[in-house]
Design a protein with these regions (language model features):
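Active-site histidine-anchored catalytic micro-motif
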Residues: 1-122
C-alpha cells in the first residue's frame, strides 16, 4: 500500500482538514461530456482551484484512469501499479481488472516506476 508521502505538504494531512479544503474548492457544476481531462498535480495551494474546477465538471464514473509522467526515469516508461493508495480520506483501490486489460506490449506492471513518483498523490 502506498502511503500519503506528501500529505501535510501538497494538501492537508488530516481527513477533516482535507474535507474542509475540498468543500471550499469543489463547487457543483454542469457535467460536460468528455473522455479525459488534463489536470494540474501540484500542491493544492498552487493549483487546487484549477484542478477542482475540472473535477467538478467530470461525469461520474466507477473508474478513472490517472496518467502521469515518470519524473525520475526509473522502471518502465509506461507502467501500471497494483498498489492501493492510502489517503487522509481513506484507501483508494486500483481497478485491477482494467489494469490487466491494459497490460501488454507497451504497458506493464512496474512498481519501480511508481516508487518515487509524487504527482499522482495530489490527484488520488
Amino acid at each position: 500500500m502506498r502511503s500519503p508521502a506528501v500529505a501535510g505538504q501538497f494538501y492537508p494531512g488530516s481527513g477533516v482538514e482535507l474535507e474542509h479544503q475540498l468543500d471550499g474548492m469543489l463547487h457543483p457544476e454542469k457535467e460536460i461530456s468528455c473522455l479525459g481531462a488534463v489536470v494540474p498535480h501540484a500542491g493544492y495551494m498552487y493549483s487546487g482551484q484549477v484542478a477542482a474546477a475540472v473535477y467538478s465538471r467530470l461525469p461520474k464514473a466507477e473508474t478513472y484512469v490517472i496518467i502521469g509522467p515518470n519524473h525520475h526515469g526509473f522502471g518502465l516508461p509506461v507502467a501500471l501499479s497494483r498498489d492501493s493508495w492510502r489517503t487522509p480520506l481513506g484507501v483508494a483501490e486500483p481497478d485491477l481488472e482494467l489494469a490487466d486489460l491494459l497490460s501488454g506490449s507497451i504497458i506493464d506492471y512496474d512498481e519501480t516506476a511508481h516508487r518515487h513518483e509524487q504527482d499522482r498523490k495530489s490527484v488520488v
